[in-house]
Amino acid sequence: MKVTLIAILTCAAVLVLHTTAAEELEESQLMEVGMPDTELAAVDEERLFECPVSCEIEKEGNKDCKKKKCKGGWKCKFNMCVKV
């Protein structure tokens, strides 16, 4: 019974250490991204206008308005590109 308890506690300790190490690695990788927050905000602002602009162009050409698909993990919703 003692051996089982020791084995369970050891596994729990290893799991906690592994999880902590994985979180630290993920945080360090996120901080190494080269694009500053201001550039990301500019990209997001551009994406918000992508769908309605393409839709208006199609309306002016007397065609049925079909939303252009957004690319790169974005989709059209409510005439805006939103992150999927």
From Swiss-Prot:
Disulfide bonds: 51-65, 55-76, 70-81
InterPro entries to which the protein is assigned, alphabetical: Hwtx-2-like
Endpoints of the signal sequence: 1-22
Subcellular localization, as worded in the UniProt entry: Secreted
Keywords: Disulfide bond, Neurotoxin, Postsynaptic neurotoxin, Secreted, Signal, Toxin
Expression (tissue specificity): Expressed by the venom gland.
KW Signal (keyword) present: yes
MF GO annotations: toxin activity
Propeptide residue intervals: 23-47
PROSITE patterns: HWTX_2
Origin superkingdom: Eukaryota
One GO location term (cellular component): extracellular region
Family: Belongs to the neurotoxin 12 (Hwtx-2) family. 02 (Hwtx-2) subfamily.
Function recorded in the entry: Postsynaptic neurotoxin.
Protein name: U4-theraphotoxin-Hhn1n
Organism of provenance: Cyriopagopus hainanus (Chinese bird spider)
